[in-house]
Amino acid sequence: MTERIRLQALAKVNYALEVLGARPDGYHELSTVFQSISLYDEVEIERADRGFELVVEPEGAETGPLEKNTVYKAHRLLTELIRGRLPVRVRLRKRIPMGAGLGGGSSDAAATLVGLNELFGLELSDAELKEVGLGAGADVPFCIGGGTAVGRGVGEVLSPLPPPPPHHLVVAKPAAGAGTARIYSAYDKRLGEKKSSVAPVVKALREGSLGTLAKGLGNDLTPVTSDLVPEVRKLEEELLCAGALGATMSGTGTAVYAIFGSAAEARTTERSLRAPFVEVCEPVAHGVVILER
């Protein structure tokens, strides 16, 4: 019987994010293109005698109160589904910054679901895990399988796309966050400013054109987020001035990323930026990875 499992929880960016309007349930209808990237957290799950324990590293990493933590939520939702106990100790090693729009919380929940399913031999399908995961976060279903996909609804209705041409991403995040609810509230007050579309990005991916993909990057939430956190706009401008083929904010921010054609250009830009978080990444064709069991 396996006693412990270790997994990679991969971050994501949104190549395009189009807000289609508010929904009666308080969420927003979206059309977006997700892409998994090589930045990741590590989730280690170990069987325990009873209960649930979460240890977050490094000490002081901001993950919020336990009852709002996505790892805890994923565990609770799975125990409710199977109507049984899953006593574990979870160690979460954070590398993906929180409040960045990079899917850190969602990917942690995704890895937790995959890990619990394997550790306890639950034999749930990916489709069942994705359905459970939606209760922990709108991006969890994508983060389970990862790769490249169009997301609709709140992002949970997924259609796979061809992987992008090889490239490097420089991901940067300012110190300040803005908060999803605050961003959407500001967006709703400025309706009519929609500029982004997923169509050029989908076309570029199907044609395998990196230049067209980079030119098509866009996010309807960037203007309002930039008003709340001006560093977002500044980072985007710095990345473009450094020679990026294209740049935009990911998700609800406040992380900004840029596409570069070569690793050398990306590394040079990484060294030149003064943001608190800067990382060179690559697109990857998968979601959660089991490292050890």
Role assignments for model-derived ranges:
Residues 91-120, 138, 244-260:
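Glycine/serine-rich anion-binding loops at beta->alpha junctions
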Residues 1-100, 118, 122-127, 154, ...:
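ATP-binding N-lobe of GHMP and related small-molecule kinases
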Residues 50-64, 112, 134, 207-217:
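Short, basic/glycine-rich phosphate-binding loops at helix/coil junctions
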Residues 145, 150-246, 261-274, 279-293:
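Conserved, helical-rich catalytic subdomain that frames metal- and/or nucleotide-binding sites
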